[in-house]
């Protein structure tokens, strides 16, 4: 497991993986539990890999995270209960997966 402490480290690692393995690369071996900001992370991206096991329970902002992206993976099990900002998270993206069980009361 690769532990990242902040958004910058995560962004750099994702760019490296996509460069080496392509847009369907596996990212579930990255521990993102310390990251609090994922805004614009995959914005304008062709990424469509597996991030289903990410622990996003400490994330506060996911605004524009997948805007204009090709992502359509299964993220239904994400714990988004602490996310405060989801503005335009999936705006103009290909995302069409079921997230109806997300607890978004925050």
Residue spans for each PLM region:
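Negatively charged
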Residues: 1-106
């Amino acid at each position: 497991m690769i532990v990242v402490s902040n958004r910058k480290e995560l962004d750099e690692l994702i760019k490296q993986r996509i460069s080496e393995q392509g847009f369907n690369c596996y990212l579930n071996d990255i521990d993102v539990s310390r990251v609090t900001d994922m805004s614009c992370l995959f914005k304008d991206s062709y990424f469509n890999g597996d991030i289903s096991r990410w622990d996003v329970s400490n994330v506060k902002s996911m605004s524009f995270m997948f805007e204009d992206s090709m992502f359509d993976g299964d993220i239904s099990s994400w714990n988004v209960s602490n996310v405060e900002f989801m503005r335009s998270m999936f705006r103009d993206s290909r995302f069409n997966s079921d997230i109806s069980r997300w607890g978004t009361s925050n």
